[in-house]
Each structure stands twice: as C-alpha cells, then as structure tokens.
Amino acid sequence: MDNYLDLMRARREQILERFYAALDRAGRPHDAASLIAVSKTVGVDETVAAIQAGYRHFAENRPQELVRKLTGLAEHPELPEVRFDMIGNLQTNKINAVLGSAELIHSVGSLHLAQAISSRAVRKIEAGELSGPQRVLIEVNVSGEESKGGVAPDKLRELIAQLAQLKNIRIKGLMT
C-alpha cells in the first residue's frame, strides 16, 4: 500500500498544480473552488490512502458505497475528518441512506426527488440523525440529451421557485 500512497501523493500534487493554475488564470483565489476526489470503484483501504495523501473531500455515486466507505472509515479514528458528497442519479428508495451521510447531494433535477428528500429529512432531523436541512445542487441538463438527468434550462427558474418552498432542503448551487 506504500506504493499506492506515494502514487496518490504525487498525483494529488500534479492535480493541485493544474487546479491552482486554472484558478490563477481565471483571477480567482485558490479557495474559490474545491477539489473533490471521486472514490467510486475503490475500496476503503484505497480511500484511507487518499486521505493520508491529503484529500479531504470525497464523492460517491452509489448510496450503498457511501455508507460502506463511511462505516469502514469509522474504524480509522486516527484519520482526519473528511467530507462525502453524493453524486450521480439518486433514486427515492435510496434517500434514507444518503441523508445524514452526504453533506451535499449534487443531482437533484426534479421536484419529485426534492420533495422526497425534504419529507424524509424531517424524520432524520427529528431523530437527531441530520443537523438541519439537506444541502443540494440542482442538476441542469444543458446538453438536452434525454439519457441525461436534470431539469431543462428553460424550466430551471420554475424548479428553483418550487424547491425554495421546501423547508428541509437548501439549494447551494447548480450542477451541469
């Protein structure tokens, strides 16, 4: 695993160089954007190595993998605290696994999904499993491809207005 850790450290440094250079070219401060390590397809040991290499913000695209990673990482109290987000399609039957585990859900593209998240968040908040409204990004389908998720750009304002009425979610931005 030492070789993997060395590889992770070196790769992270290369990525950060390019990341900061892009921010510099855009005239933005280095803290204006976040580097998110997508940990899908790797196990808990590899995620531990990524944390040891300096990554602190992760994302998963499957709720069961998110829960598995968090459970596995709980066995490593020596590690610094990290953040996990949920990316990718979220089915309503998987919402409970994500609430209280993911700090941000990146893929809310419909009123139906947002309502389901908001209503289930109430129960999680009452049970002390969620500290407040679930933070979400609205997924916008800018390509117009039917195979892609998200709201059409011409329906975005309407969806934002509808989601703003839901008291147990907080819109934090857009995901395209």
Feature roles, as predicted:
Residues 1-176:
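Conserved alpha/beta-domain cores
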